[in-house]
């Protein structure tokens, strides 16, 4: 199987790329990037009847939440170009949800870039020849400026080393074609005011659990890999001097922990999430600012 990016397309890959084909620059955040790579190669993209391990660990896969999550996934496509030559999927994983496939329906090719080779093998099974597959570091994308008609990055940048997250946003903007848009789904993590308010008692227990797991790790008793994440808050993002224009909307205002606790299938769980979805649509900027998962729509201005 060939994973070299876009063979025969000299305009897409830089003549002297900063990242070679299939090579990850590990000069910054070396251990973190290696840990993320190993997590997904060894565990995250294990597959079972329930789906991939990544979703089983980090998502609420219960039927009561399915319609809400499905409609949240569909929000991304509203802000992507309907058509074009290349759509870049940054940290594509295996393109695990059907809604994800729809994002590139009107594009000739979907370029999947991921730090995990195993992710790209699985993505190839999903997309076939529609896809082009590149092992790459999101903070050092090996593509020419102004290349892609659209870019999507879902739950990626908060797994990038904290010191490189600003660069990762800038890399997405750099490779985006002028007058086009990119969609980045981020997470404020524990800095989401709404989730702090709703989950405070449970967050205390979670903090204690993490301390116990960290102690077990230090004693060499950890029996499973963990995934790095660093979540900046809205203040950090709003305080950067970005070279791009952007709008901030909600992708989803609540975390899987929230839905698992409050969306009880026997106590109007579906109705609760349906009302929440309508509220998010009515006030997308409010919930993007204060909820769990902002959807950051980056736009690239035409050349001056």
For the regions a protein language model found, what residue spans apply to each?
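A short glycine-rich, Lys/Arg-flanked "PGG" loop and its adjoining helix->strand segment in the class I
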Residues: 166-178
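Short alpha-helix
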Residues: 223-244
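A C-terminal cap/extension of S-adenosyl-L-methionine-dependent methyltransferases
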Residues: 235, 246-304
